[in-house]
Amino acid sequence: IASCLVGSEMCIRDSSNTVRLYNNGLISLQQFCAKEGIGTQVALNEGIVTFKKDSNHYTIPQAVAMMKPRRVVMTFGTNDTGMEVSDFIAHYTALIQAIQQSYPYTDIIVNTVPPVPADHSNYPHMDQARIDDFNMALLEMCEQLGVRFLNSAEALKGSDGYGIADYYTSGDIHLKSVGLKAVLNYIRTHACQTDDRRPDTNNIP
């Protein structure tokens, strides 16, 4: 992915953990579109992206067309674990296809849903087995759609199959700075080498 994690070349789509990447100074504002608590359905249909000197709100597919990133890394699913796997994949597929239609020149990389630590008492409804099911379904979806799959979950998982406790806030599912750095390092060291297909990079907000 991230041999090109520079400037406007990569854009990260996510919810709360990507907000934390920005808040911890690990990525720039030009590199992400994120909002805490969103799932795939909201990401497709709601205007959650804004730009400076522009009062309009844009959906993620619309924003991708405006930002013209070389690559898009998508990390959704934490806020979707209450739905059936088939519904999650249907929403995710629709989101990917909307981005492809809006801006066909970007390489889409689908990242795994992050694991949760064994102690996630603040979020008792979260289920690691469901997350594993989501990630297996995401791999199959990527193969069917011809987009890339990134298994960053392996950088966060311990030998017990849960997230490494030191990477998470106690009793929580959100990553601390050390966990965020582990994810970002994984993205950077699992580079995807492709040609830059963008016709131009002009007029990026």
Tell me the role of every PLM-derived stretch.
Residues 1-7, 11-12:
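Single conserved hydrophobic/aromatic residue that forms the stacking wall/gate
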Residues 16-20, 37-41, 78-83, 114-118, ...:
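Solvent-exposed loop/turn segments at secondary-structure junctions
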Residues 92-97, 135:
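Generic structural signal for well-ordered alpha-helices
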Residues 54-89, 114-119:
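Oxyanion-hole/transition-state-stabilizing segment in secreted/luminal serine hydrolases
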Residues 26-55, 82, 172:
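Acidic/histidine-rich helix-loop elements
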Residues 13, 31-34, 70-76, 107-112, ...:
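Structural recognition of the beta-strand scaffold that forms the well-ordered cores
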Residues 116-205:
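Catalytic His-Asp segment of secreted/periplasmic serine-dependent ester chemistry enzymes
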Residues 75, 79, 97-132, 154:
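Active-site segments of SGNH/GDSL-like serine hydrolases
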